[in-house]
Amino acid sequence: MIVLGLGALASGGGFVAWDRLAIKRLAIVEPGRIVRGAWPGPTALLRLIERDSIRTVVTLTAINLDDPKYVAQERAIRQSDSRWIIIPMRGSTATTDQMAEAADLVADPANQPAFFHCVGGHHRSNLVHAAYLIRHRGYSANGAWDVVSRLPWSRPASDGADRVRIDEFAAQCIPVSFPEDHGHDAKADSLDRAHHDRGDPDPGPVRGGSLGNG
């Protein structure tokens, strides 16, 4: 894990040419607390940080320090009061330890509101989303898979490797809760878990809203 605070960032000028004006695959995991998406351009990231008062940005990928995406995001974070944490997941997957680490980071009230992202906002973000539900909300592997597989960009028929890793994570997982975390209604959480474990119809994910030009 790499933690980058304001003091750790190199000085620099404005943004490099690389930018994306809207965050793809933006979705709310916990209203007011956790949001996920694809790799954001610096303009869209700063809009999200301002709109949602993001305290912590968690990046779920290994990336070279001279990659234009890294350089642009570094400079964006430097302009904010947010903390940036990188968990170097490689390829389109993660180890179960990395899943637990990321889930604990975004679940910690001291880090919230938190935004986590990989590159495409799909496989690694789905794994961390599922890990959070299993480790911190008491979901079964089936229930967590039900949630992430219903996201519009998920492809349940071809995302089998993600499902296997979620099952592995659930088999090894020790549930965790933060003593100061009073943000959930226990009864509502229980009903929500039961709903997904039964495979009941779901109205769909909560969208994060547009952070484009408009």
Task: Please name every model-derived segment.
Residues 1-114, 127-214:
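Cys-dependent protein tyrosine phosphatase-like superfamily
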Residues 118:
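Short cysteine clusters
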Residues 121:
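Substrate/cofactor-recognition hotspot
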